[in-house]
Amino acid sequence: MCGIFGIVSNEVVSSKNLDILAHHAEQRGRDSSGLYFSNEDRFSLYRAPCSISKLLRKVNTDSSKFIMGHSRLITNGLSDNQPVYQNSVCVIHNGIVVNHD
């Protein structure tokens, strides 16, 4: 199981709104988490073997207007932790993605 959330705003995302969304996502899994967000003109990606609440305490999202988050029960190990970023594309999904040639 996993929880997914995202915020896109013209204003900086409030920590209160982010905490509410993270709390709801955490109901679906607490073993690993990930965040992808913008601080001004720079994007940051974090993945961790802890709850989304713990991860949020370790990163600075104070100037973010765009945040995607993922919280899950580990089913395939930490190597499958999300978000996944490759070739300028960031993906968070609910399911299993199998690589294709």
Question: Locations of the language-model features?
Answer:
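N-terminal glutamine amidotransferase
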Residues: 1-100
